[in-house]
Amino acid sequence: DLLYRRGGAYERIGNFEMADKDLLDSLKINKDDAYVLNYLAYSWLERDYKIQEAIEMLEIAYSSKSNDPYIIDSIGWAYYLVNDYIKAEMYLKRAVELMPDDPIVNDHYGDILWKLGRKIQARYFWRSVSKMEDVDQELLQKINLKMIKGL
């Protein structure tokens, strides 16, 4: 819908106040829209904002779209941010299975593995990102640093 697309556009240019307004207004129309819930929740996770509320939104999104790899990645990352590494690993392992060529998903999974003490496996997933094509330079720099120093 229009509010979802406009909210996404605002979010991409960094106007988070307007993005949140449009995305929340979109949820007033359809409170269970999994894609709007995921977009808004992930945006909040990226800003370290309303983490618990974002997790609740992602659980709703996941309940209706349990095979959507983006939603699975988001909920896994949310659990990572609250240090629930066991739950996070369960979701992110599935996200990697569904999107093995996605750099963000592989990066997230590597981070989880590192936190679980599986450092060789973590470096394997980070290294796979460094070999992918068209990876954002900023992400590549972070990956290269992780491969050297870890987390």
What is each of the regions a protein language model found here?
Residues 12, 46-47, 81, 115, ...:
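Register position in tetratricopeptide repeats
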